């Protein structure tokens, strides 16, 4: 993912609402939103590219109440193409029977094997004690992004947040605008899984921001401008999918994915279900 907007326990009916865009090269093969054949309790799209590591996902949900999503941290000067695919981390969290703290601790030695990332992990398996955390193997020091030697999960308080290709809530223009429009959509949402267009409308906004508002992330100004919209579209790279996930406090959920190519058309998948929290899952 390259833009994740999320509401955590800030709506009377929903525990978690996520509206996200995944940006990628058009030629990179990706499996559409579906239940995974090798982990049949996990729902999400999936990377089909030939990469080092487990086939991952940018955003996924498991029936036992786990959610995870990931963005890369834009730092072109330090990017190493030989490291493991970051989407592997979300797949590992969803497929393992570990708490958030146990998972981060178990992966501690492996975090150096990934380029910079932001990882969201939620555990809704216990309705009386839901948890959402943000974890990154990078930190901001002296105005520059540095590698973090020891990684700790940061607990997220109830509220509305935006995450792109920098630290959590870094006020990039797309994050500021996205959070504001997401908050409006949340306020209008009556908790009935209807009116998804309230979310997809702003996710599909291709308007670039003025150069004076853009961050300096190490790419040239033309590319900085091309990457600035919520919805990106260039010749070879762009927003490949928009995803809306809504999880009610009773454990019912809806996930909608819209998939895009270089044309203006899209394909859509919508799946609804019920989390089986603290119960034996049998699919």
Regions found by a protein language model. Name each.
Residues 1-283:
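N-terminal nucleophile
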């Amino acid at each position: 993912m390259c833009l994740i907007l999320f509401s955590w326990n800030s709506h009377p009916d929903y525990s978690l609402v996520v509206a996200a865009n995944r940006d990628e090269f058009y030629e990179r093969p990706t499996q559409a939103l579906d239940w995974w054949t090798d982990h049949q309790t996990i729902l999400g799209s999936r990377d089909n590219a030939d990469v080092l590591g487990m086939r991952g996902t940018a955003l996924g949900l498991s029936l036992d109440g786990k959610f995870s999503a990931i963005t890369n941290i834009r730092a072109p000067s330090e990017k190493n193409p030989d490291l493991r695919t970051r989407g592997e981390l979300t797949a590992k969290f969803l497929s393992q029977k570990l708490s958030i703290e146990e998972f981060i601790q178990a992966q501690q030695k492996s975090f150096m094997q990934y380029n910079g990332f932001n990882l969201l992990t939620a555990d809704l398996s216990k309705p009386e004690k839901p948890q959402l955390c943000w974890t990154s193997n990078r930190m901001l020091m002296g105005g520059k992004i540095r590698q973090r030697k020891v990684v700790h999960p940061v607990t997220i308080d109830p509220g509305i947040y935006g995450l792109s290709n920098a630290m959590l809530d870094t006020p990039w223009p797309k994050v500021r605008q996205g959070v504001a429009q997401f908050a409006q959509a949340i306020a209008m949402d009556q908790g009935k899984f209807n009116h998804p267009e309230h979310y997809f409308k702003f996710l599909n906004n291709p308007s670039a921001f003025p150069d004076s508002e853009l961050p300096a992330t190490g790419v040239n100004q033309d590319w900085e401008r091309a990457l600035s919209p919520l919805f990106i579209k260039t010749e070879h790279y762009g927003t490949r999918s928009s995803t809306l996930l809504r999880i009610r406090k009773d454990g019912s959920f809806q996930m909608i994915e819209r998939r895009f190519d270089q044309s203006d058309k899209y394909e859509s998948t919508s799946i609804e279900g019920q989390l089986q929290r603290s119960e034996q899952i049998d699919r």
